Amino acid sequence: MKVAEVSQQYAALPWRRAQGFEILLITSRETRRWVIPKGWPMPGHSAAESAAQEAYEEAGVGGQMTAQAIGHYGYSKRLRGGTKKRFRVDVFGMEVTEVLDVWPEAHERTRQWLSPREATALVDDPELAALIRTFAGDQSGQALPAPTCSQAFWQKLKALLRLLGLR
């Protein structure tokens, strides 16, 4: 199996204070997994600007971005031909000040405001869940507890819920 070099992406972690501290997740287009808006670097734009553009296109939100990344996570994707591509995603916090009713990918995605605990339970990637947990704890002044069940248990439960069409 071939392993490709690591590709860079940028993401926004949209949040607001409404019914307490909330995180916005969206579904991916193909697998319908819960994720945060992310994409490729955009020529002529900073990393934070690229992340903000993805948040607008994928989630229909705008707001104030953190100047620096709040963290990063990695993931791998198997491409046709057997190559495994690796990605590093630098994540920027976005305090949401605008939520649009119409946005470019509205017909392709679902968006949902969630408590940090709900958000960390729904995302499949353990590194992203840990980043959300840490960021939410920093913003609320309270550390969120780590899940008490093993990651393998959560992965199996999520796969079962997807098979049953409940997620």
Language-model features, listed with the residues they occupy:
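Generic N-terminal leader/processing signal
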Residues: 36, 56, 115, 154-156
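Class I (Rossmann-like) S-adenosyl-L-methionine-dependent methyltransferase catalytic domain
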Residues: 1-5, 15, 76-80, 145, ...
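Short, flexible helix/strand-to-coil boundary loops that buttress conserved ligand/catalytic motifs
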Residues: 38, 123, 136
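Unchanged
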Residues: 41-130, 163-167
